[in-house]
Swiss-Prot record:
NCBIfam families: PRK14668.1, uvrC. SMART domains: GIYc, HhH1. Its main location: cytoplasm. Residues 15-90 form the GIY-YIG domain. GO terms for biological process: nucleotide-excision repair; SOS response. It is found in: Cytoplasm. Gene3D superfamilies: 5' to 3' exonuclease, C-terminal subdomain, GIY-YIG endonuclease, UVR domain, UvrC, RNAse H endonuclease domain. It holds the Pfam family UvrC_RNaseH. Interacts with UvrB in an incision complex. This is UvrABC system protein C. The UvrABC repair system catalyzes the recognition and processing of DNA lesions. UvrC both incises the 5' and 3' sides of the lesion. The N-terminal half is responsible for the 3' incision and the C-terminal half is responsible for the 5' incision. One of its GO terms (molecular function) is excinuclease ABC activity. The keyword Cytoplasm applies.
Amino acid sequence: MDASAVRKRAAELPAEPGVYQFEAGESVLYVGKAVDLRERVRSYVAPRSDRIRRMVEAAAAVDFAVTDTETQALLLEANLIKRHQPRYNVRLKDDKSYPLVQLTAHEAPRIEITRTPDEAATVFGPYTDKSRVETVVKALRETYELRGCSDHKYEGRDRPCLDYELGLCSAPCTGEIDTDAYAEDVESARRFFDGETGVLAEPLRREMETAAASQAFERAASLRDRLEAVETFHEGGSEAVSGRGGRRLDVLGVAVEGESATVARLRSEDGKLVERDRHRVDAPADAESVPSVLAAFIPQFYAERSLPDVLLLSERYDDEELDQWLHAEGVDIRVPGAGRAATLVELALKNARRTTAEADGPTALARRLGIDRPERIEGFDVSHAGGKDAVGSNVVFVDGSPETADYRRRSLDDENDDYANMRRLVRWRATRAVEGRDDRPTPDLLLIDGGDGQLGAAQDALAETGWDVPAIALAKADELVVTSDGVADWDDGPALRLLQRVRDEAHRFAVQYHQQVRDAVSTPLDSVPGVGPELRERLLKRFGTVDGVRSASREELERVDGVGEDTAAAIDAAL
């Protein structure tokens, strides 16, 4: 992406907290958090370091997800970095994890703060403020006398330890409290971490008032500080992006606009919000359409996917057969009104609404061209060097966003004729579609990278094959839109920006493939001592192109199998 592309994308983002991702095709290059997404992404117009400059140049798109608070953004950022391992997230990718609280899977569960929870434990968090977590856990132990000792120390005791004398443990190890009573205390701790602040705040408040009445002012002040930590523990914390582990949870939020709708899905695995996706669907004509959208979306989406354990919805659908199916599959359906679950649903709704707003590009484009809303647009571009190593790209955008799984590319005849190459590329796509050899849906619009000549070549190919799909072109130099009716200079707006994104992505994808084809024949790596054909292939696979290898640090080179210090130094010197 160049400075202009970054500036345009930043203008499309909300001025809200959230997480952003720089992406190149299916690869996530960088994940970052922001108090203000728009301003943060705008700062990448002029990167401060060479490393970030290279990242921006390699990126093709910027995706985002809004959150309610900066803390939620911080934790979602950490989860996404751990999941995607982006190349340019050096500091955070290797950073330590955030503290968790676990109740162990023991007959008398232990409560403790940890960064590496036991597999079978009940886990809460992560949390960003460790000191506050320590205060809360200490308060829980004093109030409910939950044990904190290791299982090794617990086993075989014949008398209580010092924690019992200090009022920090009820000594289940020696039977000072029976199993049922201890289980009730553990359940109180669970309820607190599930959002019921009162189960801990009320006992602390009573104790504070008693201390103040007895003029034990230091004790009362200490309890006041502890009470404040407890009462603010769930404010803007991590529970929106992480919760009790062990189950898969999907959250669906729906935003309806006219006759179409966006369904945003958030996925939580093992208690952490790790992924989100968005889908456009046709909405029923009735005004109360959210339940109808859900009733249509759920069976279609999950027909070929594994169902979650819990499904959180923004509204309840009215479909008895769907209810019976989900119940038979063991799915717990909830429409939460408060707490962590409600916060997750609100996040899904926010992302659905943002996607609906972002999808205005296809609607604006339909108005400008006088066609039906082009939900699916395919972009085409050709890249070569003086007619050598000619390649073509075919990218796909659905509702204004890249559909990278549907990207295609192919080598073309080595001919220094842009029009002939474009004709071959579009004919290849059209022929496969007409003959039923391309399983991708028929697009609503084709966008050709170029001017009147390239568009004419593409239209010739469409006429030859009988593939009835409208096509337009976008010229690079003056950003002129070329149609069958002539050339137009559109004002900057959602329609033009969408065409620019498709055109730029087709160009990027073509250039990237051209470099790979060129590098597959002969590269500067061939003359580097210690780099044979297999190692060259691994390097190109890891870094994409020779330019990618050239921009890599020695440390990054040494992470490739077969590259030691000497070889990394030789590569660095040669390139």
